[in-house]
Amino acid sequence: LFLCNAGSLAGYLFPFIFAAIGISNIAPKGVIPDSVIYSFYIGALILILCVIYTSAKVKEFPPEEYAAYHGITHESKKEKTNMFKLLVKAPKAFWTVGVVQFFCWAAFMFMWTYTNGTVALNVFDTPVITTMTNGVSRVVLDTQSAQYQTAGDWVGILFAVQAIGSVIWATIIPMIQNRKLAYVLSLVLGGIGFISIFFIHNQYALFASFILIGCAWAAMLALPFTILTNALTGGHMGTYLGLFNGTICVPQIVAASLGGIVLKMFTSPGSVAPEVNML
């Protein structure tokens, strides 16, 4: 969890750092700013190096040792089943935690998508322009403006603050013996953080919001799989954990597919889309 958030922290800070040392964070329409391009290049390089290092250093359990450790007998290995049967027999925790996961990951998908526009409009007073598409006029933020690009850099700082909050909260979670209580408390704090963004118009006050969101993020990365593995018995743990990853992917697909439709419902004619409502 620490390394995950440490990597996030570095990635979020790259655009801000590059802009601070003089690399342009402004570009013409349809062109990606240099500060963002260099951030992606460095991120890709770090990812490749980490994958190579992990592949070279991490060794798998020998099958015999894995079977002995998990109490898997030769007879149980012969038992064949499919994913649908496993889902029917899944423990209650698989479904209850899965439902919670659905709404958590949908919320974070909206955050990653709409935070930039929210901060640009509500905090940095980004100017708006009117565009015409297929004969329909729309009021949108001027993405080429200095305010919008500055807001984008600041969002990187906010996400870095979220990562710091997540690391700090991750050290507190083990002190709470009841895992369900720790999970609930973390998500409530994260929810308060999301709601508070609607009322905050100061760039530094948003630090508090994203620290609270970091509490939810820490719990989402650690507790669901812990709760699930403790509820599992038998030799299908790997399959169940793989299926459980669907509670991460599916909600993001749904949120990405429906987000624009929901935002349009909030948008009044002649007004810029209130992306803060999505948070």
Short names for language-model regions:
Residues 189-201:
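C-terminal ends and interior cores of transmembrane alpha-helices
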Residues 61-99:
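Juxtamembrane intracellular "pre-TM" segments in multi-pass secondary transporters
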Residues 34-35, 125-163, 278:
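Loop-to-transmembrane helix entry
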Residues 20-45, 261-279:
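A membrane-interface helix-boundary motif in multi-pass transporters
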Residues 44-64:
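C-terminal membrane-cytosol helix-exit motif in multi-pass small-molecule transporters
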Residues 2-23, 245-256:
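Glycine-rich segments within core transmembrane alpha-helices of 12-TM secondary carriers
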Residues 1-3, 232-244:
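Loop-to-transmembrane helix entry/capping segments in MFS-fold secondary transporters
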Residues 1, 219-233:
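Intracellular juxtamembrane helix-capping segments at the cytosolic ends
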